[in-house]
UniProtKB/Swiss-Prot annotation:
Subunit note: Part of the 50S ribosomal subunit; part of the 5S rRNA/L5/L18/L25 subcomplex. Contacts the 5S and 23S rRNAs.
Membership in a protein family: Belongs to the universal ribosomal protein uL18 family.
InterPro entries listed in its UniProt record: Ribosomal_uL18_bac-type, Ribosomal_uL18_bac/euk
Pfam families: Ribosomal_L18p (PF00861)
GO MF annotations, alphabetized: 5S rRNA binding; structural constituent of ribosome
Top-rank taxon, per record: Bacteria
SUPFAM superfamilies assigned: Translational machinery components
Protein name: Large ribosomal subunit protein uL18
GO annotation, biological process: translation
Disulfide bond entries: none
Amino acid sequence: MIKKESRNERRIRRHRRVRKKVFGTPERPRLCVFRSNKHIYAQIIDDTIGHTLVSASTLDPELREKLQKTWNIEAAKEVGLLIGKRAIEKGIKKVVFDRGGYKYHGRVKALADGAREAGLEF
């Protein structure tokens, strides 16, 4: 009997394929996105040492009081603006965008646009 893969399993396979090519360096770290049903998370990671340099999500206290809903496009854009601001403060200007196996559409695109508005270069 043929079993159909779940959406999340397909996303994970796509993400593994993309991660073979996308690698964060100290000069150009990786901006990684994770999307759940209620929240969106973003991290800037240096893959050579395996450390998270900057992170932001809809769970951050400064965004929690500002946002009414944490699962919509406006919330994702705010997370993008916040991670961009924090990255610029740490001296990070250029990043490689890792969409996490998700389509570049909706909340993922809004986060990327917010990060670009804050001054990050992809």
